[in-house]
Amino acid sequence: MNSELLIQLGSLTLITLTGPLIIGIIFIRKGNL
């Protein structure tokens, strides 16, 4: 397997995992304000 492919897969999984987390944090901050 190519290291570039692994890096792309890793970044994709990171984005899919952190995406909802960041959105949740933004919503919580808006709710507090």
UniProtKB/Swiss-Prot annotation:
What family does the database annotate?
Answer: Belongs to the Psb30/Ycf12 family.
User: Do the record's keywords include Chloroplast?
Assistant: yes
Q: Which spans are transmembrane here?
A: 7-27
Xref: InterPro entries = PSII_Ycf12_core-subunit (IPR010284)
**Which GO BP terms sit in this record?**
photosynthesis
Q: Would you name any one GO CC term?
A: chloroplast thylakoid membrane
A Pfam family it matches: PSII_Ycf12
> This protein is called what?
Photosystem II reaction center protein Psb30
Query: Which function does this protein serve?
Result: A core subunit of photosystem II (PSII), probably helps stabilize the reaction center.
| Subunit architecture | PSII is composed of 1 copy each of membrane proteins PsbA, PsbB, PsbC, PsbD, PsbE, PsbF, PsbH, PsbI, PsbJ, PsbK, PsbL, PsbM, PsbT, PsbY, PsbZ, Psb30/Ycf12, peripheral proteins of the oxygen-evolving complex and a large number of cofactors. It forms dimeric complexes.
- Note the HAMAP family from the entry: PSII_Psb30_Ycf12
Q: How does it sit in the membrane?
A: Single-pass membrane protein
Q: Which domain of life is it from?
A: Eukaryota
Compartments where located: Plastid, Chloroplast thylakoid membrane
Q: Report keywords, A-Z.
A: Chloroplast, Membrane, Photosynthesis, Photosystem II, Plastid, Thylakoid, Transmembrane, Transmembrane helix
